[in-house]
Design a protein with these regions (language model features):
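Long, contiguous internal "core" modules enriched in hydrophobic/ aromatic residues
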Residues: 1-93, 103-106, 179-182
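Alpha-helical transmembrane segments
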Residues: 27, 102-104, 161-167
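Extramembrane terminal tails and long inter-domain/linker segments of multi-pass membrane proteins
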Residues: 154-185
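Central hydrophobic cores of alpha-helical transmembrane segments
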Residues: 115-126
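Hydrophobic, well-ordered secondary-structure elements that form the walls
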Residues: 57, 101, 132, 173
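Extracellular/periplasmic helix-loop-helix junctions in multi-pass membrane proteins
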Residues: 3-6, 71, 110-114, 135-149
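Juxtamembrane helix-break-helix junctions at the cytosolic face
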Residues: 101-113
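Hydrophobic alpha-helical transmembrane segments
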Residues: 87-98, 153-160
């Protein structure tokens, strides 16, 4: 989101990381809310692992040529993100989104356990949320901060997700008619 930043691979990386977030969200919902059986969780864990590897590959193949070429219009995007106050966020992101899920999702036990898969995917989702802030915020702020607007947007998203789940399950009392059942059936 820098005016002079240019990268041909950024769109592909953003698309693949969005798919990674979708797969992690699907596995998270299946583990915590849908109470899926172990075989389905194992398949979702394998897909999450595959998208983790693909996203890590895309980020590495995005950063390596920029670092090697050292072109000012490309390097200017990464300079504030790897120096100063943003360095620790970069390290946390590398662990939460790229390097952490890889060894933890390699075990069969982690992919078949609701608690482990749900915990791993929740860390991935939080890491990807922080990564979106990491992509945008250094252009506007010199030091990292998560304020009320960022937290309220995240709370609104999770609230809408929970509300849609409650509506889909027919458990929200305001949408229930005693004689006809759930409205819309």
């Amino acid at each position: 989101l820098d005016l002079h930043f240019y990268s041909t691979l950024f769109g592909g990386y953003f698309f693949v990381s969005g798919l990674y977030a979708g797969m992690a969200g699907w596995a998270f919902l299946s583990a915590w809310f849908l109470r899926a059986e172990a075989d389905r969780l194992h398949d979702l864990g394998r897909l999450t692992l595959a998208f983790s590897i693909l996203t890590t590959y895309m980020m590495f193949s995005h950063i390596l040529p920029i670092w090697y070429e050292n072109l000012p219009e490309e390097v200017i995007f990464f300079i504030p993100r790897i120096h100063g106050d943003w360095l620790w966020i970069t390290i946390v992101l590398a662990v939460m989104v790229y390097l952490g899920p890889l060894p933890s999702l390699l075990t069969i036990r982690a992919k078949r356990s609701r608690v482990l898969l749900g915990s791993i995917t929740s860390l991935i989702l939080v890491g990807l949320w922080i990564e979106r802030l990491w992509l945008v915020q250094p252009h506007f702020e010199e030091s990292p901060r998560i304020g009320l607007p960022e937290l309220s947007m995240a709370a609104a998203f999770w609230g809408a997700l929970y509300l849609s789940r409650m509506l889909a399950a027919g458990r929200l009392g305001a949408w229930r008619n005693e004689e006809e059942g759930v409205i819309g059936e």
